[in-house]
Amino acid sequence: MASTGSQASDIDEIFGFFNDGEPPTKKPRKLLPSLKTKKPRELVLVIGTGISAAVAPQVPALKSWKGLIQALLDAAIDFDLLEDEESKKFQKCLHEDKNLVHVAHDLIQKLSPRTSNVRSTFFKDCLYEVFDDLESKMEDSGKQLLQSVLHLMENGALVLTTNFDNLLELYAADQGKQLESLDLTDEKKVLEWAQEKRKLSVLHIHGVYTNPSGIVLHPAGYQNVLRNTEVMREIQKLYENKSFLFLGCGWTVDDTTFQALFLEAVKHKSDLEHFMLVRRGDVDEFKKLRENMLDKGIKVISYGDDYADLPEYFKRLTCEISTRGTSAGMVREGQLNGSSAAHSEIRGCST
């Protein structure tokens, strides 16, 4: 019979415990071959609220539409911009989950006097209050996500977002790199972005808080783009010819702005190959989402069971994709300000 010490040793080995007494690390999810073999220039990254919420979880306005409207309402109340009855009405609409786009539109109208001068609107003040000092509110795990996004951009990927914040641009600036924020009010720049002439620009399809006049909540707000056939054709060609990778997006494809830009005129969507990274969570909900998205040409992929699994999964994916992009000669020296090492390496992996 084996000694007690030997038995303990065998048990430790069976359960994967080592000298430090730590349990084995969780086995990482495998990367989907059809995604990991993409090159950066073949991708359009779509950044949703889930990414912003992961980067700065202490900012409620980043977590959802409802959270943003509540934060704007709180700011308006703090600045004494609403009558008691008005604030009660808005609070009631939020509590009852009324159409949030309409609620947001009504609130913005209330904060914006009848003038074309954005500087004279209180809406701008409320926005700046809501998104104040975002740099100091970023968490390290969230920065890892932004680092991966930035690395793919440097290697040729395009980026668009449904978010109003500029967290990615702020992170890039902290790394000594300059990204441009675009919105749909500038048709010329949007066209150049779609033609891949502004790869180091982030397209905010709802606008960005630093330019309140460019914020749109409904397709009616950017008819100039929708009526510009050249711009729309270039935008839709992206959805037909590239692979969109949805990050932290959930149901972004149901967003009226996204649909108007990318989905409505695109035929045979089920023949396309796009990807959506989501937390597995509830199994039935996951299966339902996967089935619904396949009709739109989107493969739903689980990065893990917990939100905390995303940064590491996306980092591994970025390393794999960037390696292929670099070997194909995608990295161009001097593309961004900063050292050449930044172009070829991401922390924890070599490309």
Curated annotation (Swiss-Prot):
It comes from Homo sapiens (Human). The modification Phosphoserine is found at S9. May play a role in Cajal bodies formation. InterPro entries: FAM118. GO terms for cellular component: Cajal body. This is Protein FAM118B. It is found in: Nucleus, Cajal body. The keyword Lyase does not apply. The modification N-acetylalanine is found at A2. The gene is FAM118B. It comes from the Eukaryota. Its main location: nucleus. GO terms for molecular function: identical protein binding. Belongs to the FAM118 family. The keyword Phosphoprotein applies. Keywords: Acetylation, Nucleus, Phosphoprotein. Overexpression changes the morphology of Cajal bodies, while depletion disrupts the localization of components of Cajal bodies, reduces splicing capacity and inhibits cell proliferation.
